[in-house]
A protein has these predicted regions:
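Acidic, metal/ion-coordinating pockets
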Residues: 36-341
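Bacterial Sec-dependent N-terminal signal peptides
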Residues: 1-14
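Glycine-centered structural positions embedded in regular secondary structure
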Residues: 7, 194-197, 283, 317, ...
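Hydrophobic core
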Residues: 15-23
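Non-catalytic terminal accessory segments
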Residues: 5, 30, 36-42, 65-68, ...
Length: 403
């Protein structure tokens, strides 16, 4: 009798336990993600060729600028970052931050003043930048001081520019950034992102001549040299930050535009481009669409993401890499590219827009100053300009000589 009663009690407890477990299972069904499918998205966002266009004003024309500007670009970069896990993004710039009316004015009027472009960029949290050819228009000493005073010097990666006499790099030859990416299931994948920074090897020489001072190495040759160096350092992924356009299929020695050729280099996983002030891929078509290995829709070229963007903050470029693991090592399982454009409805970041500070009044006054007036029905011509000087041509010549 006692054993029978005990058996009934045990059976009742077992049944109630099954009901409880089943009830909880119904409320929160378990979701299983296999290790092979559990990936993390690494999003790389970049700007390029900002050329001093910081605010919503075009001080060269005195008009409102609605299709670009870092103050609107900053909004796009924030949104792009917010779409992925906070640990899963990187922000880069490809150079030519300077070289426009505003940056030239500041340099000429007060060369010790901080360039607001770098002040603004320091607030945006760039992970790495490279330099464009036009940075070198402002002399090496000037650009070094600007980057140092704004805390941006440590962000610079410039692989193909060295000191002529010592062979030493002026800034970091390359860089590895370790990212602890968060996967879809909440786990972590540690990936070492290797960065190579390239600029136009002939530099720019408006105010100084770098002959005997700096040496610019051919971009393609330099990238081929840097890849094994980064691999030896343990880089899992290698990205080229190229102040260089896509260019020809077989660029000439010291060519400024080499992006397509860079996609053919073994070990390179993605190429980010600028310099030419044009988007690729572009729905309207580009001259590169018929190159071998080019997917004009996805921006995947020779199996690798290749993105080139416009100037003055008109667009940002993005490369998304899906990162998984194979044999306990990070591996790329998917890739995509994207370009996002600024327009009049893009929200303005007030902090970035205010970075010009007191310079704003100076620029507004200068751009609105009337130098001369011409009657509406006046006709200007220089039909005989090839035979003799005239006032119209001489004015232009004087401007060029002064510049």
């Amino acid at each position: 009798m006692r054993l029978g009663g005990l058996s009934k009690k045990l059976m009742a407890v077992a049944l109630s336990s099954v009901m409880v477990v089943s009830g909880f299972a119904g409320l929160a069904p378990a979701v299983s993600v296999s290790a092979a499918d559990d990936t993390a998205k690494l999003r790389m966002i970049f700007t390029s060729d900002l050329h001093g266009q910081l605010t919503t004003e075009d001080y060269e024309t005195g008009k409102v600028y609605t299709t670009g500007g870092l103050s609107r670009t900053a909004t796009l970069t924030k949104k792009a970052k917010a779409e992925v896990n906070a640990k899963n993004s990187l922000l880069f710039d490809l150079g030519d931050v300077l070289f426009d009316y505003t940056t030239d004015y500041i340099y000429d009027v007060n060369s010790s003043a901080q360039q607001p472009m770098y002040t603004a960029m320091a607030k945006m949290g760039y992970d790495a930048i490279t330099l464009g050819n036009h940075e070198f228009d402002y002399t090496l000493d000037y650009i070094q001081k600007q980057l140092s005073s704004t805390g941006m010097s440590g962000k610079v990666v410039l692989s193909n520019v060295t000191n002529v006499n010592t062979g030493a790099h002026i800034w970091a030859e390359n860089k590895i950034i370790t990212k602890n990416l968060v996967t879809e299931s909440g786990k972590t994948i540690s990936v070492k992102v290797g960065l190579i920074g390239e600029t136009v090897p002939t530099l720019a020489k408006k105010r100084t001549n770098y002959t005997g001072v700096l040496n610019g190495e051919d971009i393609v040759k330099n990238v081929k040299k840097e890849v094994p160096i980064l691999q030896k350092k343990g880089a899992d992924i290698i990205v080229v930050l190229a102040h260089s356009g896509i260019g020809e299929q077989k660029p000439a020695e010291l060519d400024a535009n080499t992006g397509y050729a860079l996609t053919k280099i073994s070990g390179v996983d993605a190429v980010l481009c600028g310099h030419l002030h044009k988007d690729f891929p572009d729905a309207n078509g580009t001259k590169y669409d018929d190159y071998p290995g080019v997917n004009k829709t996805t921006g995947i070229v020779n199996g690798k993401p290749l993105v080139q963007i416009e100037n003055r903050g008109a667009s940002i470029g993005m490369v998304d890499l899906n990162i998984g693991t194979k044999n306990n090592k990070p591996t790329i399982t998917g890739k995509s590219t994207q370009i996002r454009k600024v327009n009049a409805s893009t929200e303005v970041d007030p902090t970035i827009n205010a970075a010009f500070g007191n310079w704003t009044k100076t620029f507004m006054a200068d751009s609105s100053q009337i130098l001369s007036e011409v009657a509406a029905d006046t006709q200007l011509q220089n039909y005989f300009g090839t035979m003799e000087d005239n006032d119209a041509i001489q004015l232009l010549n004087n401007i060029k000589i002064s510049y």
